[in-house]
Amino acid sequence: MKDEHNQEHDHLSPKEPESYQKAYACKEQQGEEKQEASEKEGEIKEDFELKYQEMREQYLRVHADFENVKKRLERDKSMALEYAYEKIALDLLPVIDALLGAHKSAVEVDKESALTKGLELTMEKLHEVLARHGIEGIECLEEFDPNFHNAIMQVKSEEKENGKIVQVLQQGYKYKGRVLRPAMVSIAKND
């Protein structure tokens, strides 16, 4: 058996064992290269994971910013509509005052005239429409409230106590609870 093994290697040149060494060295080098490639692959994977996480976080931030902007625009749009109604209401107040003045004059001339009745119906309809949109007159009962009333003058009154509303000089209005225009009133001062 030993002879067979020697016979197999007899035809090899003396340089061939050197080629085995080169092949072995080459194989070793390939192993090192594979290890380096594996390490590089690991580094690339790590780098990819980091970049992926950064991009994901950036996406989430941008998405959150977008949602916040969207909500703010919706709120701003809603507020703009609210203020548009308020502006229209403010522009209508002089018209309402004119109708009230016309009605007051018509009542003084003839309470039962068609003009007086027409003005009353017009005022009713106007107040219904305004109420439907959140615009209503300010109550001017007995108590003076500086949040809703503006005292223009003080007058003596036998029927009213000090500080009570005697007369409404100009109707006040509010829009959804906010004062558009305070009611102008006179209050009692009996001292």
From Swiss-Prot:
The keyword Manganese does not apply. GO terms for biological process: protein folding. GO terms for molecular function: adenyl-nucleotide exchange factor activity; protein homodimerization activity; protein-folding chaperone binding; unfolded protein binding. Residues 1-19, 29-45 have a biased composition (Basic and acidic residues). Keywords: Chaperone, Cytoplasm, Stress response. It is found in: Cytoplasm. Belongs to the GrpE family. GO terms for cellular component: cytosol. This is Protein GrpE. It holds the Pfam family GrpE. Residues 1-45 are annotated as: Disordered. CDD domains: GrpE.
